[in-house]
UniProtKB/Swiss-Prot annotation:
One of its GO terms (cellular component) is membrane. The keyword Cell membrane does not apply. This is Reprimo-like protein. It is a single-pass membrane protein. The modification Phosphoserine is found at S109. The chain crosses the membrane at residues 67-87. It is found in: Membrane. Its main location: membrane. It comes from Homo sapiens. The gene is RPRML. InterPro entries: Reprimo_fam. The lineage of its organism: Eukaryota, Metazoa, Chordata, Craniata, Vertebrata. Keywords: Membrane, Phosphoprotein, Transmembrane, Transmembrane helix. Belongs to the reprimo family.
Amino acid sequence: MNATFLNHSGLEEVDGVGGGAGAALGNRTHGLGTWLGCCPGGAPLAASDGVPAGLAPDERSLWVSRVAQIAVLCVLSLTVVFGVFFLGCNLLIKSESMINFLVQERRPSKDVGAAILGLY
């Protein structure tokens, strides 16, 4: 481990067990503040607006702009998907009505029947 993280000169042994058992506990003379002070980013993890507080102001503005871009992209993609869906449904309904219109108009005329009977 990192020698600055654990103070090897002040490690305590547990129940007389030597070796690596004390190394896992660390130095008990240091308080919680010392352990937390060694880690970077002592600020809270999130600000009140939901943006990660550990970011620099430039990174915060970049993060906000990325979130805004993602939101706009999602709205536009949903608009396109629903537009294609409703346009397709509308075209399907129109084509079905046109097919029904053509089917009703395709009936044999009386002249064709008379010509067929006249040949026999």
